[in-house]
Amino acid sequence: TKVIPEIDAYRYSTIAAACIKAKTASGGYVPAEDTILQKLYYDIATVQEIVGDNTPLVITISRMVAAILSMSDKLSKKLDVTDFKQGDVSFKVKSLDGQHPLISVGSERMKTEYLFKDGKTSGQEDGGFAATASSKNINWIITPRKAPVAVSKTDKMRIFDPETNQKARAYAMDYRKYHDIWIPDQQIKTCFTNVKEELS
């Protein structure tokens, strides 16, 4: 319950930071019902200008922004339900015009910058993560399906028998799991991030 939000926050903020650095991001747009569709289509067109029409795109969108689309009678007509496969898991998501899957993510995980607490430094003993004071709100991130490469590695698992485990008379396991996201330099220009606040 704690790990997945932290991984999401790290990955989305990493993509956003790369887009901002590469100038494939726009800022200063506060989502509103009368302009959101036009803005979204324009950003999709910006990506398609580079990758072409046949490259599948995924739109990772803030849940509060997605709600504007879903709650509007006019805008919701543009949304269809489609199957989205991620690894071996297939699930149903809303998509724009039946083409571009909309992956809705909690707003607290859609910021441009976080402090990831190491659990050791003074003031960081509780671990976890928090948005920094200078972080901005991400409206959406548009990426080709294969541009960001999410990777994870599991370190050697240790198993403790009940005689060794001092916390309970039961077996215990521990392991380290490492996560990262890679975006090859030539692929950054194929991604686009839309941010609520102005970009400096």
Predicted regions and their residues:
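Sequence/fold signature of self-assembling virion shell proteins
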Residues: G28-D34, M71-S200
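Extended, solvent-exposed, turn-rich assembly/linker loops in the middle of proteins
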Residues: Y12-V89
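Long, contiguous amphipathic alpha-helices that act as assembly "spine/axial" helices in icosahedral shell
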Residues: T1-K21, E49-I61, D161-I183
